[in-house]
From Swiss-Prot:
Residues 409-460, 983-1024 are annotated as: Disordered. The gene is HIRA. This is Protein HIRA. The lineage of its organism: Eukaryota, Viridiplantae, Streptophyta, Embryophyta, Tracheophyta. The keyword Amino-acid biosynthesis does not apply. InterPro entries: CAF1B_HIR1_beta-prop, HIR1-like, HIRA-like_C, WD40/YVTN_repeat-like_dom_sf, WD40_repeat_CS, WD40_repeat_dom_sf, WD40_rpt. GO terms for cellular component: nucleolus; nucleus; rDNA protrusion.
Length: 1024
């Protein structure tokens, strides 16, 4: 026996939590407190090869974790290495061709080998402390401090199931070498045996750990290579600590390994079984077989297991199942607890690591351990006991369709993962509406933007570099009862960036624009930028709160103010009973200019934008006979294109908000008035009085205008038909939570009000809760909130990537806001919150009429139900997409209450069922009978149903909420309506100047001229 401690195996002087030897014997990996996984050359510690080049000792350093690496485990095929960390993430690394790299500024030499992360497994809500691969490497089990064990499908990277049953921290997990069971051990002093056939609980044992004392980092239990014994940790049999051994089948404790003076942290069986070398009794006694009492003969041919144990008493013991005493005891090797062990592939070398940051290797001789059984002999032994175990852990396929859909499900998951990677690595350029102080042509705008980027490049690069720095990390430090330090990284919020970037970007299609002037208040908000100028021409940058406006870029030209609404006690919440204040980041100034810019692509792609500017003016007014003069405040509104003034007007008072599109312009004033202009600058209607100053304004790409006043009144008008579509108050959003303080209760702060893509009003509060008004239900729907912090899908909204949809943008805002809160952290979920979160997201995407996000949420929801084997909810989902029973369609269609729409958001439900839902259900064979049932039903429907016409792509003229009866196809945009192409014209009411049902914006004149032409033609015909 040879023992050594290589001094160069270290993690920058920090603790080493895990060690594992590659099954092919070429490398071994360690994980430590420096957040890194290090891969070492096995030849550097080989007892026969001591003269290896020192540069080839450390082969690679993996730096993808952001917390201490608690566990590293090699796959059986030696291709992958898995690592679990305090950052709640599991990384799977694979060696790639080429040479390695190094971290910039680390001072370390470049890696000899190139190892890259090929898969990241997210789902745990606390530290991942133990990992174990299945016998065929198809699955990975992970134990975590969130009290759960996750089972991962390594073909797709998806979580197959979550095993819940422990009441405290899960600190050890191991896979049965036969593949039929998984065992886990927890701080609740229990060991649970799980079946892999249906992931149910086979047995719970809790008696032999009830008297255990103290606490340990890990409880790493181990299964014998023959599959018959399960050795656990942290047992206690007075007066010594023990390792109870469970026997397969009855799962009762057969015996204990007794002798350590402190809790046992880790046990590790040798990969192989051994036989004794035939020898004399004298030689046998020297190696300690059964305390020297064994006899030569048949017992020499019996195979036995070898097991190593590491304890908190800083010692290592090696035992055999044929002896009541340890074969080997290693003392004074380490200064702290032994936390992990690993055997070499040949079975004669033991690797150990300790919390003191060192590693030890112990090389045994065949005379000490015995003769190792070959792999063939071990397989024959298992086959004689359990039969052919290949594929035993898998459920049998009951139909060919199951295999086809499993293949489709794998491709579906792979494409989703690839799309996610592309989204994280790309910066998507999206159309925008800009606000700036000039109206140059596009080419000059691009040139100006490039010049501005060059002049501010150094500042921006510095800011972006600061934002990318991952350390130092905000941490919370406390000490456990045993004196050990516990460090928990806190969630890092998004920094408040001081971006002074002017918006000169290109816009690829028409979008409306809106802007607002600043008002008095505090400076605690996070405003977005609009461009303002004082009378001297110097440009002022104002930042305003709403982070995701319809322009869909970070720096937008939209509403600037936040609105605080407080309900007066004892009132009903109507207009006039609201206490209101406003708050923004800068003081009110009478010299603030407003400017919006609108692109109209009817004039060509290279056409310059049309700019509307509101400039406050003050001048003295001399009154005849009066001694003194008075100052008159008014606002000059001018519309320009390519530097040429198209029209101008003057309004008494100060303009606070502007909005416009190619059909109309609107200006709201602080005295509560609203003026609407035609695109040519004519006043389309008398001044509208709202009763209080306008604070938020928005418009769509046709004739819809939204306005919110300082009193909290919300209006939505159809200007083309001169009617109010919606008049409601934001007071219904005032919280009445009894748990809130008296200063907060009955008060809301609104930071954004806009028209959603579905045409419904969308309100975002300072808490980042988002509300959508549904005119069908006549109430507000909360489509984004922070009610599901424990959901496994709460972290799926990437805070750094560009959101791919309206709902995703709202959820990212919620996550950013929650990350800013001190002490915010994820909590454990029992599955209920995750399911409720997905159901809420599914309903919200439907209300927002976001087809792509609806499909994504639907797939995630079905996969979750399939993973949980929730057949009742899966059946309900499938039935809702399948439709009424075959042959009942006519009866159902005659009754409007039983009518069934075959389309959802423009997509045929049967297509979603066939292409998305059923393949997602195929991920778990436990529900394959339900899957086959709906495959047959769908085939029957497709045989008897007639071809349904495709849904019309027209968008309803006015729709402020709910799901319209006529929906667009996925990805299509509603057609932009112009002044000469109204959406609807009532033929019973001729459009003329006397008809108040039509807005006088160019349509009346055209229609009147057409009528006169027809009258002239009729008179000529009668005359002839």
């Amino acid at each position: 026996m040879i023992a050594e401690k290589p001094f160069w195996v270290k993690h920058e002087g920090l603790q080493i939590f895990s060690i594992d030897v590659q099954p092919n014997g070429e490398r071994f990996a360690t994980g430590g407190g420096d957040h890194k996984v290090r891969i070492w050359n096995m030849k550097s510690v080989d007892k026969d090869l001591q003269n290896i080049d020192t540069k080839e000792r450390l082969l690679a350093t993996l730096r993808d974790h952001f917390g201490s690496v608690n566990c590293v485990r090699w796959a059986k095929n030696s291709r992958y290495v898995a690592s679990g960390s305090d950052d709640q993430v599991i990384q799977i690394h694979e060696r790639k061709p080429g040479s390695g790299t190094t971290e910039f500024g680390s001072g370390e030499a470049p890696d000899v080998e190139n190892w890259k992360a090929v898969m990241t497994l997210r789902g745990h809500t606390a530290d991942v402390v133990d990992l174990n691969w299945s016998p065929d490497d198809s699955m990975l089990a992970s134990g975590s401090l969130d009290n759960t064990v996750h089972i991962w499908n390594m073909r797709t990277g998806m979580c197959t199931t979550v095993l819940r049953g422990h009441l405290s921290l899960v600190k050890g997990v191991t896979w049965d070498p036969i593949g039929s069971f998984i065992a886990s051990q927890s701080d609740d002093k229990t060991v649970i045996i799980w079946r892999t056939s249906d992931w149910g609980m086979a047995h719970r044992t809790d008696g032999h750990w009830a008297k255990s004392l103290g606490s340990t980092f890990f409880r790493r239990l181990g299964w014998s290579p023959c599959g018959h014994f399960l050795t656990t940790t942290h047992g206690f049999q007075k007066p010594k600590h023990s390792a109870p051994v469970l026997e397969r089948g009855e799962w009762s404790v057969a015996y204990d390994f007794l002798g350590h003076s402190a809790p046992i942290i880790v046990v590790r069986f040798n990969h192989s079984m051994f036989k004794r070398i035939p020898s004399s009794t004298h030689e046998t006694k020297q190696v300690g077989w059964s305390n020297g009492t064994s006899k030569s003969g048949e017992k020499d041919l019996q195979s036995y297991n070898v097991i190593a144990m590491g304890s908190q008493d800083r010692t290592i013991t090696v035992w055999t199942t044929g002896s009541a005493r340890p074969l080997f005891v290693a003392k004074h090797f380490f200064g702290q607890s032994v936390v992990d062990l690993s055997w070499s592939p040949d079975g004669y070398s033991l690797f150990a690591c300790s919390l003191d940051g060192t590693v030890a290797m112990i090389h045994f001789d065949p005379k000490e351990l015995g003769v190792r059984l070959t792999d063939t002999e071990l397989d024959e032994l298992k086959k004689s006991r359990y039969g052919d175990v290949r594929g035993r852990q898998a459920n049998l396929v009951e139909s060919p369709a199951q295999l086809l859909l499993e293949t489709a499900s794998t491709k579906q998951a792979g494409s989703k993962r690839a799309a996610s990677d592309v989204q994280q690595n790309q910066v998507t350029t999206k159309p925008s509406v800009s606000v700036e102080s000039t109206a140059k042509r596009r080419k000059s705008q691009v040139d100006d933007r490039n010049k501005a980027a060059e002049s501010t490049g150094q500042t921006l690069n510095k800011a972006s570099t600061l934002n990318r720095v991952s350390s130092p990390v905000n941490q919370k430090v406390y000490r456990r009862p045993d004196g050990r330090k516990r460090i928990i990284p806190e969630a890092v919020g998004v920094p408040q960036q001081e971006n002074n970037i002017m918006i000169n970007g290109e816009s690829h299609n028409f979008l409306p624009a809106s802007a607002a002037a600043p008002a008095k208040g505090d400076s605690g908000d996070f405003p977005v930028e609009i461009s303002n100028r004082d009378l001297s021409g110097k440009e002022i940058v104002c930042r305003n709160p709403d982070l995701k406006e319809r322009s869909r870029i970070t720096a937008r030209a939209t509403i600037t103010e936040s609105l605080v609404i407080e309900k007066v006690p004892g009132t009903s919440g109507r207009d006039g009973v609201l206490n209101v204040e406003q708050s923004v980041g800068i003081k009110e100034s009478s010299s603030t200019d407003l400017l919006i810019r609108v692109f109209d692509w009817k004039d060509g792609e290279a056409a310059p934008p049309v700019c509307l500017e509101a400039c406050p003016r003050e001048h003295a007014l001399d009154t005849v006979g009066a001694v003194s003069t008075s100052m008159v405040k008014e606002t000059e509104i001018s519309c320009k294109k390519s530097g040429e003034t198209l029209w101008s007007d003057r309004i008494m008072g100060r303009v606070t908000v502007l909005a416009g599109n190619p059909n109309f312009w609107a200006a709201g004033c602080e005295d509560g008035s609203l003026q609407v202009y035609t695109k040519c600058g004519r006043r389309a209607m008398p001044t509208m009085m709202m009763g209080s100053a306008a604070t938020f304004i928005d418009c769509d790409d046709s004739w819809k205008l939204l306005l919110v006043t300082r009193k909290g009144s919300l209006y939505v008008w159809d200007l083309f038909n001169r009617k109010c579509v919606l008049h409601d108050s934001l007071s219904s959003l005032v919280s009445s939570d009894v748990n809130l303080s008296s200063t907060v209760k009955g008060t809301i702060k609104v930071i954004s009000v806009k028209l959603s893509k579905s045409g419904s009003p969308l309100v975002v509060l300072a808490t980042r809760h988002a509300f959508l008004f549904d005119t069908s239900l006549m109430c507000w729907l909360r489509v984004a909130d922070d009610c599901f912090p424990a959901s496994n899908f709460s972290s799926s909204w990437n805070l750094g990537s560009a959101p791919c949809g309206e709902l995703a943008g709202l959820q990212v805002d919620v996550r950013k806001y929650m990350a800013r809160k001190p002490g915010w952290n994820r909590i454990t979920d029992d599955g209920t919150q995750t399911r409720a979160h997905l159901e809420s997201q599914l309903a919200s995407s439907l209300a927002l009429e976001s087809p792509n996000e609806y499909r994504q949420c639907l797939l995630a929801y079905v996969r979750f139900l399939a993973r949980e084997a929730d057949e009742s909810r899966l059946r309900e989902v499938c039935e809702s997409f399948l439709g009424p029973p075959t042959g009942m369609a006519e009866a159902a269609s005659s009754d409007t209450n039983l009518s069934w729409d075959p389309y959802v958001l423009g997509v045929k439900k049967h297509k979603l069922l066939r292409n998305d839902i059923l393949p997602a259900m195929a991920s778990n064979r436990k529900v394959q009978r339900l899957l086959n049932e709906f495959i047959d039903l769908l085939s029957e429907y497709e045989d008897v149903e007639t071809a349904d016409p495709a849904p019309k792509g027209s968008t309803p003229t006015m729709n402020c909420g709910g799901v319209p009866s006529s929906l667009d196809q996925i990805g299509s945009d509603p057609p932009a309506m112009t002044a000469t192409t109204p959406m609807t014209i009532d033929n019973d009411k001729p459009v003329s100047l006397e008809n108040p049902a039509a807005l006088d914006i160019g349509v009346c004149e055209k229609t009147g001229s057409e009528d006169r032409d027809k009258q002239d033609q009729n008179s000529r015909d009668s005359g002839s």
